[in-house]
């Protein structure tokens, strides 16, 4: 449970607005050159608030409002809000990856300020590992402070937390041996592999923990376990991640579809089996 909260905190950091607590990872500044690559027209319809694209993107997108769905691949929540998994979710980290979170009012007071709780565990403090959410090009976006390297005490606490999480996982596996589970889809299996890699990462180093997440491709699965037509890499170095179109069943790229930093309009390159049968029936 502790490791899950630690990893959940890392993803929450990508999805939320900044907090005054010490930041372990900061996005690079949005230079004029990077901002010049953004689309010229403002998002439509008009937004109540503009925020940076997911990850470390620099282009403006409409912020998600309270009650709207959110996740790793969606736009961020508006100021004063945070993307939370649904209460009681058994897999909160996976829920955020799948975009099944909900924008809600910040609940930082539940944890207390960092000044009042200087001895809190890393998984508790990870709730404040935030990446700037505002659309600005100055130091407020990137910050000038270098990433803080965790102390030996914190590294030991992380190791203990990871071992406890592994023990809990082994215990759950033993209890579920007699239970029949539905077959996992290819997308879900790939997602499980990525989450397993994340759980085994050596997070504390000089690059900052979120750098590791950007190096991975997290499969974008829908609620039924299939691949979403559009798959995207996370934004990095102020640029939007590349997006491409895939077959929902196999996850392989659709022939003729582009790989671009934007919307590849995947509906133009894929015909569902139902649509294909309907077209055949209408043909003379």
From Swiss-Prot:
Gene Ontology cellular-component annotations: extracellular region
Keyword Secreted: yes
CDD domains, per the entry: TY (cd00191)
GO BP field: regulation of insulin-like growth factor receptor signaling pathway
Signal peptide: 1-21
Keyword entries, A-Z: Developmental protein, Disulfide bond, Growth factor binding, Growth regulation, Secreted, Signal
Start and end residues of each stretch annotated as Disordered: 108-184
GO MF: insulin-like growth factor I binding; insulin-like growth factor II binding
InterPro entries reported for this sequence: Growth_fac_rcpt_cys_sf, IGFBP-2, IGFBP-like, IGFBP_1-6_chordata, Insulin_GF-bd_Cys-rich_CS, Thyroglobulin_1, Thyroglobulin_1_sf
Location of this chain's protein in the cell: Secreted
Biased composition (Basic and acidic residues): 117-127, 152-180
Motif Cell attachment site: positions: 261-263
PANTHER family per record: INSULIN-LIKE GROWTH FACTOR BINDING PROTEIN, INSULIN-LIKE GROWTH FACTOR-BINDING PROTEIN 2
Subunit details: Interacts with igf1 and igf2.
Protein purpose: IGF-binding proteins prolong the half-life of the IGFs and have been shown to either inhibit or stimulate the growth promoting effects of the IGFs on cell culture. They alter the interaction of IGFs with their cell surface receptors.
Name this protein carries in UniProt: Insulin-like growth factor-binding protein 2
Species of origin: Xenopus tropicalis
Name of encoding gene: igfbp2
């Amino acid at each position: 449970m502790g490791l899950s909260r630690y990893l959940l905190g890392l993803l929450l950091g990508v999805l939320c607005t900044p907090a005054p607590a010490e930041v372990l990872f900061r996005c690079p500044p949005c230079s004029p050159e990077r901002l010049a690559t953004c689309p010229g027209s403002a998002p439509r319809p008009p937004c109540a608030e503009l925020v940076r694209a997911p990850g470390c993107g620099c282009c403006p997108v409409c912020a998600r409002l309270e009650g709207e769905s959110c996740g790793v691949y969606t736009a961020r929540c508006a100021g004063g809000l945070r993307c939370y998994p649904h209460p009681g979710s058994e897999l909160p980290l996976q829920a955020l990856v799948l975009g099944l979170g909900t924008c809600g009012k910040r609940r930082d007071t539940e944890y207390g300020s960092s000044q009042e709780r200087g001895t809190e565990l890393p998984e508790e403090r990870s709730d404040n590992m935030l990446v700037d959410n505002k659309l600005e090009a100055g130091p407020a976006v990137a910050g000038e402070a270098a990433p803080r390297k965790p102390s030996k005490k914190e590294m030991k606490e992380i190791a203990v937390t990871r071992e406890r999480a592994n023990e809990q996982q082994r215990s759950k596996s033993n209890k579920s041996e007699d239970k029949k589970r539905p077959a996992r889809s290819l997308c879900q299996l790939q997602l499980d592999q990525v989450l397993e890699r994340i759980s085994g990462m050596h997070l504390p180093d000089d690059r900052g923990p979120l750098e590791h997440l950007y190096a991975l491709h997290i499969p974008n699965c829908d609620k039924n376990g299939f691949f979403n037509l559009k798959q995207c890499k996370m934004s990095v170095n102020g640029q939007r991640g590349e997006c491409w179109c895939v077959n929902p069943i196999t996850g392989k790229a659709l022939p003729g579809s582009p790989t671009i930093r934007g919307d590849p309009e995947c509906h133009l390159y894929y015909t569902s089996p139902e649509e294909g049968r309907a077209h055949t029936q209408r043909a003379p």
